[in-house]
């Protein structure tokens, strides 16, 4: 019943099949390099199962997380780079995986992040959330070169439209999100929510300014068997803060391959350019 903290360290391994039971937070990695977490189970963490802040070279393998309280996210990364997540099971009562730039005392871009071969189950909020928090003082932080591949999403249940989306890129705080791929994703059930949510916005609850834009996004080989899904959303903010160059390739909803935005059930709003379906 305690938190493991890696603060300003290098070349650390946290290994084994032990359990962290009801910690305030599971594992914290801050201002560190080359940290491996492998085999740990975290049960009912009050907040993050694993948080990464302004760190480089984090690898998380074969981790299992179960949580039931609000704010008990799974894996959250703020201003991190060169991150690999492989073979994790996350059943969380908030975002399963969230990727931001600046938050708290962490600053800088988030890039080169790869999530593979994993299972996500979100009680509320998002299975996957990218964007939201950044640095409006500098206005130059970027989230880029991010890949989610071979992922099973078992559930998404969120009643607030602003926080819906199994696969969400929702930039605020002058963030720019680019070069992001979702590939081989299987969504089993959506109790309440959206499949895709791409938005440049100014969330006055969490942001101090709007995002800068979203571009070069690929959704490939995505299937969903959920029957009661709210329309997905694609929405820019203004002519200088757009969503552009988004590819939907081989999207299958309830056994039918999608050939149009209408079939994809997407609400395409203003300041959106170059949306393609293959």
Briefly describe each language-model feature range.
Residues 1-278:
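Extracellular/periplasmic carbohydrate-active domains that bind, remodel
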């Amino acid at each position: 019943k305690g938190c493991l903290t890696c603060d300003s360290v290098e070349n650390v391994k946290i290994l084994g099949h032990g359990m962290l039971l009801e910690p305030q937070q599971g594992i914290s990695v801050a201002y560190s390099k080359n940290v491996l977490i492998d085999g740990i189970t975290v049960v009912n963490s009050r907040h993050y199962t694993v948080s990464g802040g302004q760190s480089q070279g984090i690898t998380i393998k074969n981790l299992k997380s179960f949580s039931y309280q609000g704010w008990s996210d799974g894996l959250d990364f703020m201003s991190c780079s060169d991150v690999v997540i492989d073979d994790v099971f996350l059943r969380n009562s908030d975002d399963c995986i969230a990727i931001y730039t600046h938050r708290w005392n962490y600053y800088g871009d988030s890039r080169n992040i790869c999530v593979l071969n994993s299972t996500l189950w979100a009680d509320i909020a998002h299975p996957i959330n990218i964007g939201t928090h950044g640095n409006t003082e500098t206005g130059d932080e970027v989230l880029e070169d991010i890949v989610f591949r071979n992922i099973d999403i078992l559930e998404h249940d969120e009643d607030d439209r602003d926080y819906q989306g199994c696969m969400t890129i929702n930039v605020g705080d002058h963030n720019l999100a680019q070069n992001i791929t979702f590939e081989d994703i299987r969504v089993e059930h959506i109790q309440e929510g959206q499949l895709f949510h791409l938005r440049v916005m100014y969330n006055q609850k969490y942001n101090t300014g709007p995002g800068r834009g979203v571009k070069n996004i690929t959704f490939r080989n995505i299937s969903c068997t959920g029957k009661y899904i709210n329309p997905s959303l694609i929405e820019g903010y203004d002519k200088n803060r757009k969503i552009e160059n988004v590819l939907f390739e081989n999207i299958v909803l309830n056994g039918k391959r999608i050939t149009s935005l209408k079939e994809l059930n997407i609400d395409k709003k203003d300041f959106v350019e170059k949306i393609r379906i293959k």
